[in-house]
């Protein structure tokens, strides 16, 4: 990320905060993003693993404790700043698969192979996302943001799965498909139930 991208990122964040502030404070804000990729790099592209996609005062290609602390502090500060205006819900990271799920399933089908059971273990998931979880938990403690956890809807038997009933729930390796995102409807209903009760 060069200085131009850094400037564009700050401008985009400023624009988003301004737009959000135009809405009634009764309307909750739900934050869903790939938070871990910005701190830790890509999860399955070898040449982009362990290279942060974001930086603060100076560009660094190493993941250091200092960088992770600064990144976490930024996440907490941003969430708490937004929570001054309205209820804020932060979504825990969506599990990232190591392969393009629909492509792998289609390839297996083309060659008459059994449906591949694409998944990652909960241990792998938590190892990848522990920094983000800790920052999210700190934001809950500091300013009362709420957490939306997709794991009960996407993971079972100690694993997070790339498909359900023979259908991919991702449209690549880390973005949920239309079919997959419908699995999270009960999770998001919490937001609307809480909003309706106020």
Q: Language-model segments: which ranges?
A:
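Extracellular glycan-modifying ectodomains
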Residues: 1-198
